[in-house]
Amino acid sequence: MRNIALRIEYDGTDFVGSQWQTNGRSVQGALEAAWQQLTGERRRMILAGRTDAGVHARGQVANVSTNTRHSLATIIRGLNGVLPEDIGILAAWEVPEEFHARYSAVRREYRYVIDNGRTPSPLLRRHAAYVPRRLDVAAMDRAIQQVIGTHDFAPLSDGPQEGSTVRICYDARCTCTEVWGQPLVLIDVAANAFLRHMVRNLVGTLIQVGEGRIDADGFAAVLAGANRRARVLAPAHGLYLMAVRYPEDGNAAADTLVAAVGVTETRMQL
């Protein structure tokens, strides 16, 4: 029995989420249907990160146990040939039997994209959240530094959580860029794991900082759970799961494969 890992990107607009659900299309459902079409096997795909309806991914990871004899290159080409247009396989590699896409991960990286132009770009409407008021990105970047380190992020979460709500945030920053002359604000956050709606609540609160509605102390109060009313949930369609990282020895095989199938540049951009 082989254990195959896949690196996946998708446009989350028309999905009800990444996990199997009974009320519409899911990323997991589409992947499993494509796998069965390619290999004849009915297998369960294990996803590294759970994304909500409308959330996109540039570097989702899944693994599947299989008896297929298809080469890795054939798996990539074959899945991309039968998957719907809003999902793509970027890479595939062999992993040890004990590898688990979710539980073996040591770092997850998310990006939130804000269209901050004078008028919203129609080209970005499904892939960036529009904020009309010019944001003070420097103030947002100063505020977000407070989340770096080990903290209880329960004040930024929604709904019941499994186990501890303490997470380790490795990096967090707010920067500016432009696409087609349209100013964008990028919010990047990396942590060992995330709680439900943690990034979207963080972003929504940071927008309050950028608009001058709350200051750094107000942001700190939200993080401490002392000012839950100032917390705002940002729209799903601006959020991207950019990458999932694994222990260094688990990526060596991936590096070899990616070079072999000619998608090194794609993987390096994750």
UniProtKB/Swiss-Prot annotation:
Q: Which UniProt keywords apply?
A: Isomerase, tRNA processing
For the keyword tRNA-binding, the answer is no
Annotated GO biological processes are: tRNA pseudouridine synthesis
- Active site per database record: 52 (nucleophile)
What top-level branch of life does the organism fall under? Bacteria
* InterPro entries per the UniProt record, alphabetical: PsdUridine_synth_cat_dom_sf, PsdUridine_synth_TruA, PsdUridine_synth_TruA_a/b_dom, PsdUridine_synth_TruA_C, TruA/RsuA/RluB/E/F_N
Pfam family for this entry, one: PseudoU_synth_1
Residues binding substrate are 110
Q: Which reaction does it catalyse?
A: uridine(38/39/40) in tRNA = pseudouridine(38/39/40) in tRNA
CDD domains named in the record: PseudoU_synth_EcTruA (cd02570)
EC code: 5.4.99.12
The family database entries (NCBIfam families) matched by this protein are listed as: hisT_truA
- HAMAP family registered for this protein in UniProt: TruA
Q: How does it assemble?
A: Homodimer.
Stored PANTHER family: PSEUDOURIDYLATE SYNTHASE, TRNA PSEUDOURIDINE SYNTHASE-LIKE 1
Q: Which family does it belong to?
A: Belongs to the tRNA pseudouridine synthase TruA family.
Q: What does this protein do?
A: Formation of pseudouridine at positions 38, 39 and 40 in the anticodon stem and loop of transfer RNAs.
Write down what this protein is called: tRNA pseudouridine synthase A
Instruction: Kindly list the organism's lineage.
Output: Bacteria, Bacillati, Chloroflexota, Chloroflexia, Chloroflexales
| Gene name of this polypeptide | truA
